[in-house]
């Protein structure tokens, strides 16, 4: 399970987002701000993976304009909303890439999640470690398909099926890309943090990204 808020806390967060989306669809501005504050940081991290630091804010703003415009037509819970917004953001990012004629390398986002545990004793902690700002800065070293799969699953919080819908791929292909990307990120993080005395109990396995 690739979520950084586990168990009851995750359920509560999902319920809050689901309720806020429903209220925002009826014109509740406070609810919309709740949705934005909850979803935007990780959505922006995904956009950075696609277009790089320089244009990420502009592309994310375009995505939110469409999200706001089409919100009334959305149906579903928090999970579906995350997938829906990620699809919109990806489409806006690909439009931007077509305009500029190239896919820039992403930069790091130090605001998504902070802090690397001194030691990852469980798979969940290992996965959480891979979504720190330091890991985000290393994603530029991954192939594009692996980078997207990792960010959609480990940062945005989508399951394999939802991520596959965003990417237009089979869930199995997304699991494979995420698995390979996480393994490589774990290696890069191990190298990058060795001088700081940070260690990892081990890279995640294929089972961890299902």
Describe each PLM feature range.
Residues 69-76, 86-108, 128:
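Arg/Lys-rich amphipathic alpha helix in sigma70-family domain 2
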Residues 25-26, 50-53, 62-79, 99-101:
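Sigma70-family region 2
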Residues 2-6, 23, 165-166, 170, ...:
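C-terminal edge and immediately downstream basic/flexible tail or linker adjoining helix-turn-helix-like DNA-binding
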Residues 15, 21-45, 135:
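A short, charge-rich alpha-helical start-of-domain segment used by transcription regulators
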Residues 4-8, 25-33, 44-62:
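Short, charged helix-capping/linker segments at alpha-helix termini
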Residues 90, 94, 98, 146, ...:
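DNA-recognition helix of helix-turn-helix
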Residues 26-29, 101, 117-152, 156-166, ...:
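Amphipathic alpha-helical segment used for protein-protein interaction
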Residues 82, 96-119, 126, 196-198:
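Short, basic/polar amphipathic helix motif occurring as a linker/hinge flanking DNA-binding modules
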